[in-house]
């Protein structure tokens, strides 16, 4: 998946779980990033590199696998395919975004 495809899918999933995370999250990929500000309504989702409470670094391919339910996010983290910095509790809430 490329960044535009991932961004579109995250926007779709976020509309279903708006308000549950209540944090600022940044996903860093091979070809850019996605910033999600879920502290405001409506949720802001863009490709700007902004400060976040939690930053998750993962490849486009591995994130695509998580979105398509081909890979578990916990498994990706435990195997080192996904790195998390910042507030770990925010990262733990992200499962609500992918359910």
For each feature predicted by the language model, list its residue ranges.
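Feature captures hydrophobic
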Residues: 1-99
